Amino acid sequence: MTVPRYAWGRVLFLAIVTIVINTVPAGSAEKPTFYMIAPSLTDPFWVTEQNGAKQAGQDFGVNVVFQAPAQDTGDAGMVPLLQAAIAAKPAGIAIDYTSKTLEAVTTAALDAGIAVVLYNNDRFEGENAPADKRIRDLAFVGQNESISGEILTRAWLPTLQSGPCKVLIVNPFPTAFVLTLRADGVKRALDAAKYPHSDLAATGDEGQNLSLISAALQADKGICGIVGLGNPAANPAAQYVGDNSLKIPVATFDVGAEAAKRLKDGTLTMAINQQPFLQAYFAVANLANQAKYSLKPVNVNTGTSIVTTDNIDVIQKCIAAGRC
């Protein structure tokens, strides 16, 4: 491994803080090796991503190394892992492109002749717009947040009462642009159906959000539906609706274990699942097909799986198997 100046320190750092999910077995030197760099492994979402990468490695007969910082250090924590991955000269790298912080290292990978695909995030908006046009052209595997917001809302609208009533959109992380994109899609669908809506800035704390949602519903009796832009918003909304026997449909993005339980008991009406297992799986599939057959990586939208009480039993089995 060739890393400028502080090589041994970085190698030691990687040995301590990264997780290798598919070590290179003896006699497999002819197999292409791919790196998948993630921001975290402390969230079940990323464990599921890891499972998808591992399965793809087995199915396509390639070596996959899945790495993440030991602590949630955001974009910056992925940079040294990507630099070390480039130095290892793999056949390809899958990058969760969360911001412009990752532009220089992504460009470095492309300059080194390494195949790159993006997964989970391809944040190119505003100040994140990459100067390197090659990055914009990279294949992306993941959920189109804005389109998913529109698809979810259109599917959910028939559960609302007819006539004029308001939808409350609860954002647990107001500074996260990804949730702004989700909200944009939700609002487009609501506007098209002529449903007024209001925004509620919440937090990542479900206990605090329960109080905020309770206050909002008590202050505005015209609210007939709630969209939580993430589980920290939707779970307490569903709890409040259930505890007070209200007939207010609640929709959300992503399906964690708690959200699955609430879909099962009916207090949560609908969710859209971005399918993290498939994000990682198809990212590796793209790289494997390019390395083996020179097939150009393609975009894959994984985020259009609607979950309701009708199919929650299957989804719960999928969650238990580490595939949802």
Indicate where each model-derived feature is located.
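Hydrophobic alpha-helical segments within soluble ligand-binding/sensing domains
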Residues: 78, 139-166, 209-210, 255-259, ...
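Hinge/cleft segment of the Venus flytrap/periplasmic-binding protein
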Residues: 30, 170, 278-324
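Beta-alpha junction/loop-to-helix N-cap segments that form part of ligand/metal-binding clefts
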Residues: 72-128, 231-234
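Short beta-strand elements in bilobed, periplasmic/extracellular small-molecule ligand-binding domains
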Residues: 58-71, 166-169, 187-207
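Flexible loop/hinge segments that line or gate small-molecule binding clefts
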Residues: 105-147, 256-264, 269, 320
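Short, solvent-exposed amphipathic alpha-helices that sit
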Residues: 45-60, 148-152, 177-196, 212, ...
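Hydrophobic alpha-helical
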Residues: 95-112, 186, 198, 202-262
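Extracytoplasmic "Venus flytrap"
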Residues: 33-60, 65-82, 95-100, 171-181, ...
